[in-house]
Amino acid sequence: MARLPQLKVFAEKHGLKMVLISDMIRYRRAREKMVERTAVARLPTEYGNFTCVSYKNTLDGHEHVAFLYGEHEGDVSGAVGEDMLVRVHSECLTGDIFKSARCDCGNQLDMAMRRIAGEGKGCIVYLRGQEGRGIGLGHKLRAYNLQDEGRDTVQANEDLGFPADTREYGVGAQILQDLGVTSLRLMTNNPAKYNGLSGYGLKVTGRVPLFAPVTMENKRYIDTKRMKMGHLFEMLEGVEPSQAESEQKPSR
């Protein structure tokens, strides 16, 4: 099978257009409905009662879930509405479930749930199949080994043959649209997530940073996200999560 450089030469020689499979997937996600709602249930948590809505991606079969907080009595159509507090969270088994100290993912999820409960209304979209910024669990563990050898989180992904971040947010945007979102305040430190959701027709009216505690284990990871990936971090070591949450208007 010809590889990309050979395909480029062939396309130029014969005057052909070349389209990557990833481009086709991105195009379809931007223009076709790729999610279908499969179930709705009440989910009591330590932060209060959420309504859990499951979705299936009809393109790749991945299941995703949205957690709604507020008074909608089981009817989630239009439950979110305008200018709502929203977190789009990529699955992180090691951080979310096993509380890995290598990253800040689990802390950010906890902070988002607590903040939504405190505000009284909001939504978390939990995107599965995005482990390790999209490279998968096995590759993420291999990246951990490379980090222990001295690479940072970006270098480790690249050494394994991946970009720094392979995620895209079309499915998350479609889930929010299905729930009736028209505008939102996005809980994120990642400008790519802000731009990604805006590119799918959602109006992001504000950015709410989530500053998790910086520790010996995650400091290099957070520094790399800030310096190489443009993530916005403004807290210092020792600041408690409850002290580190504030809201900003996005500058564009």
Residue ranges and their predicted role:
Residues 1-252:
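Catalytic domains of riboflavin
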